[in-house]
């Protein structure tokens, strides 16, 4: 392990309040277990509280076994994707739950392990997979076309220099395979200048984009929101913490639509969907951010936003096609490929 600080769950006080922890025992799903920060806080809120903790990363599940043993049956660890949380929970014999919390983003454990290939701050193999199977970041960087790379970096990383980054990657590929995080960070830094005074590394947005693409993070998020809707009892709460605008946009659209407003997936899908039966009421009227004290104490919290809703007794509506459109790369035919 490096000298990085341990994982601190962000907006913990606000998440506790949104989930009404401490108001009696119940069953809460932590759909993004990670280092276990939220799970521990949920369990500590009430001696009768139970948690089903889900993570697709086998390392996170293995790390949590000590906590599960100490909780004497109150913590159930399940390896799987949080986009399938309703199926995973029902496989444990539980039909409905009282709360679901999702912390969307890479965990500090993953960033802290150079061999996982998530961070440009430590040299390691260019991987970024949250589970062992599937396409790695190295596969994507070395095999995708210039246009595909530019689209991924522009839309998932919101990198204005996406076309230049993609071109630089293609030029570097001609000299040999791009295999490490340090090599890729160097390539990106050769064409993206640091923003004065921002403290943001030039490779930040490109690494974010590749991680999102490799793990289908936005697709998983929109599936998880619908899965939580299906598993929550009436009166149950869903709390979602996001860290960048792409994630927050999906969560905002979901809660807006499910609380009775028509939504659109932006200019790429201009026709708004008609309001469905209100399956949620809003617990937070807008995003809740960190206090100044928390942002100072925990830099990871600076960009965090919390949105929460309470499940009504309305029937489960059809999934929102607008969310799937937000999670996908816009098609070039609709003009999504322009830079």
From Swiss-Prot:
Q: What class of enzyme is it?
A: transferase
Some GO term, biological process aspect, for this entry: which one? rRNA base methylation
Catalyses which reaction?
A: cytidine(1402) in 16S rRNA + S-adenosyl-L-methionine = N(4)-methylcytidine(1402) in 16S rRNA + S-adenosyl-L-homocysteine + H(+)
Instruction: Outline the segment boundaries, as ranges, of region: Disordered.
Output: 286-319
Cite the GO molecular-function annotations of the record: rRNA (cytosine-N4-)-methyltransferase activity
Listed A to Z, the keywords are: Cytoplasm, Methyltransferase, rRNA processing, S-adenosyl-L-methionine, Transferase
Which Gene3D superfamilies does this chain map to? Putative methyltransferase TM0872, insert domain (1.10.150.170), Vaccinia Virus protein VP39 (3.40.50.150)
Family to which the UniProt record says this protein belongs: Belongs to the methyltransferase superfamily. RsmH family.
State the name under which the record lists this protein.
Answer: Ribosomal RNA small subunit methyltransferase H
Biological source species = Methylobacterium nodulans (strain LMG 21967 / CNCM I-2342 / ORS 2060)
Q: Which gene encodes it?
A: rsmH
